[in-house]
Amino acid sequence: IDHHQMKERTQASRWVDVRPEYGASASILFEYLQSQEVKIATKLATILFYAIKSETEDLGRDWTKSDRDAYLKLMPLCNNRILHEITRPKSSRIYFKYFNAGLKNAKIYGNALIFTLYDIDNPEIVAEIADFLMRVEGIEIVVGLGHCHGEGVLSMRTSHLETHAGSLMQEIIKGLGTGGGHSMTAGGQVHLESTDQAALVALEAELVSRLLQALGLDLVEPEPLVP
């Protein structure tokens, strides 16, 4: 069960339910529970609600009527204290180290912002920082890169109506790895033959070059996010 594009290895599964048009896999799970008239306990409702809330940014991006229906039906079943603890968790100092690196390395090319984290221990941090940097004034697309356990990790966010993040991710990562996503969000992975700094820098340069060419920004001089 997933809401991302079908992967090659997924096609070999005996049973598959993949709906790329949905904003969250939790919405699909909710429909299964509803169809079987399963009573949804408070903790499960809270978990499913948070999944939809975070994936769609409170129905602000990549949502469907099914996502909205699940969101609205689950909301009154939630435990607000647990939900608050999930949405406002305590974070280790290393978490803020990654944010610091992202801000320092971020470069602006017109309406696009690109940042690199290099070595990370959790691939989700790339997406979190990409979400955060979408708040920069004048920025319509953010792409983040990192290296985690032998793989290059990419995350893309966009508010530009004419840019489909999933299609753009597939274009820039073609021949290097796998990727895809939705209209406003996308992710990708690149298997790294070498993890030394020079290889990571070379990969970053290639991906940035492809992205800027695809966006028509290859002649734009970059400027740092933080002067």
Give the location of each predicted region.
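Hydrophobic helix-and-loop "lid/oligomerization" segment in the mid-to-C-terminal part
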Residues: 54-227
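Short alpha-helices
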Residues: 4-71, 208
